Amino acid sequence: EMVEISIMENQVLFKTETMYFYSRLLEGNYPDTNRLIPTSHNTQIEFYVPELLSAIERASLLSHEGRNNIVRLSISPDSVVLYGNSPEIGKVEEALNYENVSGEALDISFNPDYMKDALRAFGDMNITVKFLSPIRPFTLEPTETELDFIQLITPVRTN
């Protein structure tokens, strides 16, 4: 199908036989995401995406019932555990399957919705998750090195 593209100063129009799609440029500067992406890490772990996504979905069922919508991932050299909590309903604690873990032990909290969206973009593959600290953004990347794709998740500070 042919697509006609019209570009103006602050807008663009895509036209097909059955659709018109219009978008305009937002004012202001886009944040410099290069500063957010860590260049080093202290903890690294490999997961199979469908298994991790299923666990996040289960934990988020409880976290959505609470006020904060946060899950916690606890990584140690011999175990990886995902926690969800809702004061009204209860807690979930699930030991996760993982391939390789290296580096320092870590407890980090994050919004499960952002993590689920990031994981869905990868599909059926293994990813490597790299952490610098519990308060710094962490990255998700395909384990296969020929793919150049990265997701960035910002953690949530908890008490």
Question: How would you name each of these model-derived features?
Answer:
Residues 1-26, 41-159:
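DNA polymerase processivity clamps
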Residues 36-40:
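Short hinge/gating elements
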